[in-house]
Amino acid sequence: MKYRPLPFYLTIKKSKIHGLGLYSLAKIPKDTTIGMTHIEVGNDLIRTPLGGFINHSEEPNCERKLHNNRWFLKTIQDIDRNRELTLRYSMYKP
């Protein structure tokens, strides 16, 4: 399997929120796991390319889920083509 820093249905482009952001190239259904954003190593977090470009929103369309010391990005609603993926920033464990 070839490594891809981003899924084929995402791209990075200028964001209206801040700097660059993650945008959908196709419709993404609710409850889709997009990929890994961070890895916990001891008390440290290592950010992946996916985690480096998602912007904060008070009304996000994605959330983070922790599984085996890895944080994954998951959609919490359907995301239409050309829409920016957003996350409410919080690295605290639930």
Where are these regions (language model features)?
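Conserved catalytic SET/PR domain of SAM-dependent protein methyltransferases, capturing the structural core
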Residues: 1-94
